[in-house]
Regions:
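Beta-rich carbohydrate-recognition modules and glycan-binding surfaces
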Residues: 18-197
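Hydrophobic h-region of N-terminal signal peptides that target proteins for export
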Residues: 10-18
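Sec-dependent signal peptide recognition
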Residues: 2-8
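Generic cytosolic/nucleocytoplasmic N-terminal low-complexity/intrinsically disordered segments
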Residues: 1-2, 98
Length: 197
């Protein structure tokens, strides 16, 4: 009986600790409405793409696919969520109201699979929102199998000058998953976004 009780306590402690050490945002039918597709066509580019919510067995994921083309100063398609005075998706509600210090969040984990291409995370914070220097970016690689990609915040660089970024997760204003920067076919699946301590 003591062994069973000890095992239960160990399992409970492990689950509680895991939950306390990260903020996880799986893609679902309910929260996918918080995300939007954008392409370089908003600035005269000719890249084309779309997003769809799909399922692979028990795994629900969002898929970003299309053709990235760099003509006309373009070169991106992206899946993005953002917060505003009139809209605050659950991702930002939990980040901004976290009882832990957002500055102690260490980075991002994504559960992804793709077509072997390199993709990007674009982040804007309240400090640099809507400024030309405002995007902080990091890259990750993909494979045809599901895998967890870990991107520490200290890997992010400023898009304009390539300097190191200092990101406090509680200051994040926009978060984008982006196919960017060269001519290629995008096909990326993401089942969850997680911020870890």
């Amino acid at each position: 009986m003591k062994k069973i009780l000890s095992l239960f306590i160990l399992i409970f402690t492990t689950i509680t600790s895991a939950g306390a050490d990260s903020l996880s945002f799986p893609f679902t039918q309910d929260n996918v409405k918080d995300w939007r597709f954008f392409s370089d066509q908003v600035m005269g580019g000719i890249s084309e793409g779309q997003v769809s919510l799909e399922q692979d067995g028990d795994k629900v994921f969002i898929r970003l696919y299309g053709d990235v083309r760099t003509e006309n100063n373009g070169g991106f398609i992206q899946l993005r969520t953002s917060t505003s005075l009139s809209n605050k998706p659950s991702l930002f509600k939990r980040l901004h109201s976290s009882k832990k210090d957002g500055g102690k969040l260490q980075g991002i984990r994504l559960k992804v699979k793709g077509n072997g291409e390199k993709y990007h995370i674009f982040i804007q914070t309240t400090i640099f929102y809507r400024l030309p220097t405002g995007y902080q970016i990091a890259t990750f690689n993909t494979s045809p199998e599901w895998e967890t990609v870990e991107i520490p915040f200290n890997r992010f660089k400023n898009l304009k000058d390539n300097k190191d970024s200092k990101i406090n997760a509680q200051d994040i204003k926009t978060f984008g998953i982006v196919a960017y920067g060269r001519d290629f076919k995008s096909d990326l699946a993401v089942s969850s976004v997680e911020f870890y301590y």
